[in-house]
Protein backbone atom coordinates (compact mmCIF):
# COMPACT_ATOMS: atom_id res chain seq x y z
CA UNK A 1 0.00 0.00 0.00
CA UNK A 2 2.97 2.29 -0.57
CA UNK A 3 1.03 4.55 -2.90
CA UNK A 4 -1.73 5.17 -0.34
CA UNK A 5 -1.97 7.68 2.48
CA UNK A 6 -0.50 6.44 5.75
CA UNK A 7 -3.85 6.68 7.51
CA UNK A 8 -5.45 4.43 4.88
CA UNK A 9 -2.90 1.68 5.56
CA UNK A 10 -3.64 1.96 9.27
CA UNK A 11 -7.40 1.87 8.66
CA UNK A 12 -7.12 -1.26 6.51
CA UNK A 13 -5.19 -3.00 9.30
CA UNK A 14 -8.14 -2.42 11.66
CA UNK A 15 -10.86 -3.82 9.36
CA UNK A 16 -11.79 -7.50 9.70
CA UNK A 17 -11.87 -9.79 6.68
CA UNK A 18 -15.27 -9.97 4.99
CA UNK A 19 -16.82 -7.17 7.07
CA UNK A 20 -19.83 -5.12 6.06
CA UNK A 21 -18.30 -1.64 5.74
CA UNK A 22 -19.68 1.86 5.21
CA UNK A 23 -17.12 4.48 4.16
CA UNK A 24 -18.56 7.93 4.92
CA UNK A 25 -17.07 10.72 2.82
CA UNK A 26 -15.44 8.10 0.63
CA UNK A 27 -14.11 10.54 -1.98
CA UNK A 28 -13.09 8.78 -5.18
CA UNK A 29 -13.33 5.36 -3.53
CA UNK A 30 -9.61 4.74 -2.98
CA UNK A 31 -10.08 3.12 0.43
CA UNK A 32 -13.20 1.14 -0.51
CA UNK A 33 -11.46 -0.23 -3.58
CA UNK A 34 -8.50 -1.42 -1.54
CA UNK A 35 -10.69 -2.92 1.19
CA UNK A 36 -12.65 -4.91 -1.39
CA UNK A 37 -9.45 -6.32 -2.89
CA UNK A 38 -7.44 -6.88 0.29
CA UNK A 39 -10.10 -7.65 2.92
CA UNK A 40 -12.95 -8.85 0.69
CA UNK A 41 -15.37 -6.53 2.46
CA UNK A 42 -18.97 -5.92 1.47
CA UNK A 43 -18.50 -2.20 1.02
CA UNK A 44 -20.77 0.79 0.58
CA UNK A 45 -19.90 4.46 0.38
CA UNK A 46 -21.57 7.79 1.12
CA UNK A 47 -20.16 10.85 -0.65
CA UNK A 48 -21.52 14.39 -0.89
CA UNK A 49 -19.93 15.32 -4.23
CA UNK A 50 -21.64 13.86 -7.28
CA UNK A 51 -18.49 13.94 -9.43
CA UNK A 52 -16.74 11.72 -6.90
CA UNK A 53 -19.75 9.41 -6.70
CA UNK A 54 -19.54 9.03 -10.48
CA UNK A 55 -15.86 8.05 -10.23
CA UNK A 56 -16.69 5.43 -7.62
CA UNK A 57 -19.51 3.96 -9.67
CA UNK A 58 -17.20 3.82 -12.70
CA UNK A 59 -14.88 1.64 -10.59
CA UNK A 60 -17.74 -0.71 -9.79
CA UNK A 61 -18.16 0.51 -6.21
CA UNK A 62 -21.51 0.78 -4.42
CA UNK A 63 -21.60 4.48 -3.53
CA UNK A 64 -24.50 6.91 -3.19
CA UNK A 65 -24.63 10.68 -3.03
CA UNK A 66 -25.47 11.99 0.42
CA UNK A 67 -24.61 14.33 3.27
CA UNK A 68 -23.30 12.70 6.46
CA UNK A 69 -24.87 15.43 8.60
CA UNK A 70 -28.34 14.57 7.25
CA UNK A 71 -28.39 11.09 5.77
CA UNK A 72 -26.71 8.90 8.41
CA UNK A 73 -29.95 9.00 10.40
CA UNK A 74 -31.55 6.87 7.67
CA UNK A 75 -29.39 3.85 8.49
CA UNK A 76 -30.62 1.28 11.07
CA UNK A 77 -28.76 0.65 14.32
CA UNK A 78 -25.67 -1.58 13.96
CA UNK A 79 -26.32 -2.10 10.26
CA UNK A 80 -22.57 -2.34 9.50
CA UNK A 81 -19.70 -4.21 11.10
CA UNK A 82 -17.49 -1.18 10.57
CA UNK A 83 -18.15 2.46 9.70
CA UNK A 84 -15.22 4.58 8.53
CA UNK A 85 -14.78 8.36 8.54
CA UNK A 86 -11.38 9.08 7.03
CA UNK A 87 -9.98 12.64 7.18
CA UNK A 88 -13.53 13.98 7.07
CA UNK A 89 -14.76 14.76 10.60
CA UNK A 90 -13.08 18.18 10.57
CA UNK A 91 -14.96 19.04 7.37
CA UNK A 92 -18.43 18.23 8.72
CA UNK A 93 -20.80 20.91 9.95
CA UNK A 94 -21.76 19.00 13.11
CA UNK A 95 -18.93 16.64 14.05
CA UNK A 96 -20.41 15.67 17.43
CA UNK A 97 -23.71 14.60 15.89
CA UNK A 98 -21.96 12.81 13.01
CA UNK A 99 -19.75 10.86 15.42
CA UNK A 100 -22.79 9.82 17.46
CA UNK A 101 -24.48 8.53 14.32
CA UNK A 102 -21.39 6.59 13.24
CA UNK A 103 -21.28 4.85 16.62
CA UNK A 104 -25.00 4.06 16.38
CA UNK A 105 -24.89 2.42 12.96
CA UNK A 106 -21.56 0.58 13.24
CA UNK A 107 -20.47 -2.22 15.56
CA UNK A 108 -17.06 -0.60 15.27
CA UNK A 109 -16.15 2.86 14.01
CA UNK A 110 -12.82 4.04 12.60
CA UNK A 111 -12.04 7.76 12.52
CA UNK A 112 -8.85 9.30 11.14
CA UNK A 113 -8.00 12.99 11.47
CA UNK A 114 -5.18 15.52 11.13
CA UNK A 115 -3.84 16.71 14.49
CA UNK A 116 -4.04 20.50 14.82
CA UNK A 117 -1.93 20.18 17.97
CA UNK A 118 1.10 18.87 16.02
CA UNK A 119 4.23 20.85 16.94
CA UNK A 120 4.84 22.08 13.37
CA UNK A 121 1.31 23.51 13.28
CA UNK A 122 1.83 25.21 16.66
CA UNK A 123 5.19 26.64 15.58
CA UNK A 124 3.85 27.86 12.25
CA UNK A 125 0.97 29.65 13.98
CA UNK A 126 3.29 31.14 16.62
CA UNK A 127 5.86 32.43 14.13
CA UNK A 128 3.53 33.74 11.43
CA UNK A 129 0.42 34.69 13.40
CA UNK A 130 -1.60 33.15 10.56
CA UNK A 131 -3.55 29.94 10.09
CA UNK A 132 -0.86 27.31 9.53
CA UNK A 133 -0.05 25.80 6.15
CA UNK A 134 1.84 22.50 6.42
CA UNK A 135 2.34 19.41 4.27
CA UNK A 136 -0.82 17.90 5.76
CA UNK A 137 -2.88 21.11 6.10
CA UNK A 138 -1.89 22.64 2.79
CA UNK A 139 -4.71 25.04 1.93
CA UNK A 140 -5.33 28.66 2.85
CA UNK A 141 -7.99 29.23 5.53
CA UNK A 142 -10.39 30.65 2.93
CA UNK A 143 -10.02 27.64 0.62
CA UNK A 144 -10.02 24.71 3.02
CA UNK A 145 -12.98 22.44 3.69
CA UNK A 146 -11.66 21.96 7.24
CA UNK A 147 -14.16 23.99 9.26
CA UNK A 148 -13.77 22.16 12.59
CA UNK A 149 -10.07 21.40 13.04
CA UNK A 150 -9.23 19.69 16.31
CA UNK A 151 -6.34 18.16 18.22
CA UNK A 152 -5.96 14.56 19.31
CA UNK A 153 -6.77 15.70 22.86
CA UNK A 154 -9.94 17.43 21.64
CA UNK A 155 -11.13 14.24 19.95
CA UNK A 156 -10.36 12.08 22.98
CA UNK A 157 -12.33 14.52 25.15
CA UNK A 158 -15.28 14.34 22.75
CA UNK A 159 -15.23 10.54 22.95
CA UNK A 160 -15.22 10.78 26.75
CA UNK A 161 -18.15 13.21 26.65
CA UNK A 162 -20.15 10.86 24.41
CA UNK A 163 -19.09 7.81 26.46
CA UNK A 164 -17.44 6.26 23.41
CA UNK A 165 -14.87 3.54 24.04
CA UNK A 166 -11.47 4.00 22.36
CA UNK A 167 -10.26 0.43 21.68
CA UNK A 168 -7.07 1.35 19.83
CA UNK A 169 -5.23 4.44 18.61
CA UNK A 170 -2.61 4.64 15.86
CA UNK A 171 -0.58 7.86 15.63
CA UNK A 172 2.05 8.84 13.13
CA UNK A 173 4.24 11.56 11.70
CA UNK A 174 6.75 11.48 8.85
CA UNK A 175 9.14 9.27 10.86
CA UNK A 176 7.20 6.97 13.18
CA UNK A 177 3.96 5.03 13.52
CA UNK A 178 2.83 4.10 17.04
CA UNK A 179 -0.02 1.91 18.24
CA UNK A 180 -1.73 2.27 21.61
CA UNK A 181 -4.25 0.02 23.29
CA UNK A 182 -7.09 2.41 24.06
CA UNK A 183 -6.12 6.12 24.38
CA UNK A 184 -2.81 7.57 23.17
CA UNK A 185 -0.18 9.11 25.45
CA UNK A 186 -0.62 12.84 26.11
CA UNK A 187 2.62 13.67 24.24
CA UNK A 188 1.08 12.36 21.00
CA UNK A 189 -0.98 15.56 20.94
CA UNK A 190 2.32 17.35 20.20
CA UNK A 191 4.42 14.89 18.19
CA UNK A 192 1.79 13.12 16.04
CA UNK A 193 0.74 14.63 12.74
CA UNK A 194 -2.30 12.39 12.32
CA UNK A 195 -4.24 9.79 14.29
CA UNK A 196 -6.55 6.85 13.62
CA UNK A 197 -9.03 5.74 16.30
CA UNK A 198 -10.90 2.43 16.60
CA UNK A 199 -14.11 3.10 18.53
CA UNK A 200 -17.07 1.20 19.97
CA UNK A 201 -20.16 2.20 21.93
Give each language-model segment a name.
Residues 25-27:
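Class I SAM-dependent methyltransferase "Motif I" SAM/SAH-binding loop
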Residues 73-82:
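A short acidic, Gly/Pro-enriched loop at the edge of an enzyme's catalytic core
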Residues 97-101, 108-201:
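S-adenosyl-L-methionine-dependent methyltransferase catalytic module, highlighting the catalytic core
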Residues 17, 78-79, 105:
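Alpha-helix C-terminal capping/helix-to-coil transition sites in glycosyltransferase folds
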Residues 2-18:
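Conserved alpha-helix/loop element of class I SAM-dependent methyltransferases that forms part
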